[in-house]
Amino acid sequence: MNNKYSIAILLPTRSRTDALTSSVTSIVDLAHDVSQIQLMFGFDDDDQTGLNHFHQVIRPYLDQRRVAYEAQAFKSMGYAGLNKYYNHLAKSADADWLFVWNDDAVMQTKDWDSVIKQHTGKFKLLKVHTHNEHPYSIFPIVPRAWYNLTTHLSRHQMIDAELSQMAFLLDVMQVIDVDVVHNQVELTKDATDPLKPKVRFEGDPTNPGDFHYPQNGAQRFQDCGVIAEYMRNNGLDTSHWEGVISGKKYAWEKLIELDVNRQMSQFVMEVDEHGKVMSYKQDEKAEAVRNILAK
């Protein structure tokens, strides 16, 4: 089935006004063809500040620029439910590409949409330049088929981490020449930002809500298996994934290749027969892989 638009911008937002305006106008003003862009907004139904700003400022601007958009209001799912907002917006989007965006992000590259469209028809997760070249795709861009296969973008709150780790396991991460500034409050230390630094959902793999909790990782592998089958059926290379599941390849080799500023670390866990984490420690194999790649 053909999609109506080329790129859907998935944009949950709460309370931000000026930041949202800067984010949206950067997307629209720097696009080559706004007729092929769909903006998907997600608001909390109790966010009167955000809703008023949308109706008074954002909506008139988009109408004037003739940009397609849709705004959905949700019962607040909180920061812990961030992935649920994206999953709902992705389900409603009608585009070839689903672009996970934030209201504190600002596009920098002119004709960014043309860069993305160069990859249409390829099964890749696209990664923009941001965050001091963090190896993850902080603002992941995935083909519609990705959502259709798994029926969600992310099971876990850390949507960029989940999608990126799956892309590394499947070897479908593609860096593109698009630059984005992320004005995240943790990075900018902006005391005026209405949303303060967030609770992080990693660092304690014994916690069922943690990104690295074993069952959460197992679900990611399950989703990778579904996507890998689709890739095989379409004649795409799955050799890296096959090597990972057979134990012949180190799972995070592709991640380490992109971690040029050493922003990530890997660890291994010991679990009991019930899947409970007994202990975890730094993964010595990861450092060995780094040393090999550095030669």
Map each language-model feature to its residues.
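Short beta-strand-to-loop acidic/aromatic patch adjacent to the donor-nucleotide binding site
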Residues: A95-V106
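Short beta-strand-to-loop element that shapes/binds the nucleotide-sugar donor at the catalytic cleft/hinge
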Residues: K124-P140
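Active-site-proximal specificity loops/subdomain of glycosyltransferases
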Residues: G50-A93
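Conserved donor-nucleotide/metal-binding helix-loop-beta segment in metal-dependent transferases, i.e.
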Residues: K110-V128
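C-terminal catalytic/acceptor-binding lobe
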Residues: A161-K295
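Short, acidic, metal-binding catalytic loop of nucleotide-sugar glycosyltransferases
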Residues: T25-Q36
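Short beta-strand/loop segment that forms part of the nucleotide-sugar
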Residues: S35-Q48, Q72-S76
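A conserved acidic beta->alpha catalytic loop
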Residues: F41-Q56, A105-V106
